[in-house]
């Protein structure tokens, strides 16, 4: 006998999605996804100056910010056969790469992690063993006993002092949580680190696009002047700062995010 399960709304994408799944003998035989909201952006931009459309379509979302605006200016440029300057293309690529990294880190840690990381279990972890687990995954400088002791204290404080903390309410202790306490502690430490990474990487968009979310774009190029001697333009100080942000983010991705994604997927697959 076929059973249909409906999840409506899917809460972690702002509630604009409905999912249906047909299950027969414990196996999903069919599935359907439905977008349940129209924002009317296409209607809003109708008959407007094509050079201004990027500013409207970008407001469709404040999370996946900038990509809608970028697609808009590229569409206008393609239609008019405009070839933008190489520097403008580089700036756009840097901005989009920054938000892509932020999205991946956010999705993995903030939107997924607590589905399989037990916060309460982490409070019972041995920081020494947690450090050993972390050191087996990468050479990240923070993989120390003292670091995980401090993280454990911070999490306990969150839970004990704020009833509104996201750590204060959950299905903690449910048998579906299978990860060892030490792995949970490592994951929660990286969860908190990911918040700092997100805060830093979006500065690339702010420096080149003026703000985040919804940075500025321009049909035909980018609205940011480059002058190494002007404090109000893209000078060497700002460009070096961007390079530092990129380097720090690369370190986090290579030594934290990627090892976590691979190892936790492996652990879940072998439960």
Predicted regions: what is each one?
Residues 1-268:
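Active-site bordering "gate/hinge" segments
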